[in-house]
Amino acid sequence: MATVDAILAAKYPAKAHARRVAERLQPHQDGRPGIIYLEAQKTRLIEDNDEPVPFRQRRPFFYLSGCLLPDSSLVYDITEDKLTLFIPPVDPEDVIWSGLPLSTDEALQQYDVDRVSITTEVNSTLASIASAHGGRAVAYNIADQVSPETKFDGFSEINKSVLKGAIEQSRVVKDEYEIALIRKANDISTKAHVAAIKASIIAENEREIEGAFIATCIANGAREQAYHPIVACGENGATLHYGRNSDALIDPVTKKKKRNVLIDAGGEYRTYCSDITRVFPLGGGFTTETRQIYEIVLQMQVECIEMLRDGVQWEEVHAHAHHVAIRGLLELGILRGSEDEIFEKRVSVAFFPHGLGHYLGMDTHDTGGNPNYADKDTMFRYLRVRGRLPAGSVITVEPGIYFCRFIIEPYLKSSESSKYIDTDVLERYWSVGGVRIEDNVLVTKDGYDNLTTTPKTVEEIESLAA
């Protein structure tokens, strides 16, 4: 089996991706020739400033090119199976400041394309293709992602409605190269999570832990973060997407360290994401209450990962996580009553309000999940993926139990749900905040491959935090 670095030494498989997308467009062509036209993100300046806006390549363009250059474009002639990349011409003034850019010859060696030209040749190339196909060809592009100066004269139709969806559905199933990129992002992020946990031993503020994570990512080749890191100490962990990352780790009243830290963070490697969450104690060991909740959440995750395989119904996996949570909270005495009744009444949503996971790829919340945020069933409303998981998809498995007053208190005020919650026992757990454990898992034909190797057993975590 080839190593990650050996796989990534080859070119990004842009041509294979173009063919995959073209297959999805075939029903819309009615037997006519067709082309795909995509543009890269433009260079833009910050308002009232001469500094550029931080660059993030358009994902549809990257998927069919592997190219991170701004102001570029591509044309894929579906009939001729010919992929052409257009890169900006040399700007002598820019060379003074930034050096010589990539040449067309260098780009041809670097990217999986058939031809490289400069962007001033886009319109003449499009006209030539349209003429070669006798004016019958369809031009597929994405609405609001085409420059005004780009012309599609001579094409029988300009279709702006189907390409985006075709690319998004194609992205669900990853190839070997994409899996290697996600695995690489995970490997780097594992080092960063370990560094962050170790930094907490002497840290005094959440931002120091965040800094250790980001610095380790950059040092290992992941210059960008897949998303803004979440570093939440104490009760901050009850906020799902807490982002302030600036609280002191010492409680101002007790003058003692808060119980634990939830860190949800992932580096991005060559546009592909990782998304990993861990919870660790401040002061070496988990408190009794935090450890109890941690072990329930870990059991939720372990059992759900074991259910993964080609064709598994994601809603069933999510529901199973709730059953494990209910059993654990019943054992602790936080919940009371029957497991089935608590499940049917959706009381566990008070403690586990979000979906079990989402697709992962070039976006943290990757495309193709078909969520239904209008679902009236609170247990499934925030599930970002619906339906069966195909082999080759990468999904996060991130169960959690949270003690968020804003979410739980309405359940305590409701006669329908309050009878299932023991408030005296619950009182001991507010300071736990929240526990979430998240891994990135590849679905295979007969099972799964967990791409995340970050330590997560109680013993492993406590050893790092001591």
UniProtKB/Swiss-Prot annotation:
Its EC number is 3.4.11.9. PANTHER family: XAA-PRO AMINOPEPTIDASE 3 (PTHR43226), XAA-PRO DIPEPTIDASE (PTHR43226:SF1). It comes from the Eukaryota. It is an enzyme of class 3 (hydrolase). This is Probable Xaa-Pro aminopeptidase pepP. Catalyzes the removal of a penultimate prolyl residue from the N-termini of peptides. CDD domains: Prolidase. It comes from Aspergillus clavatus (strain ATCC 1007 / CBS 513.65 / DSM 816 / NCTC 3887 / NRRL 1 / QM 1276 / 107). It catalyses: Release of any N-terminal amino acid, including proline, that is linked to proline, even from a dipeptide or tripeptide. Belongs to the peptidase M24B family.
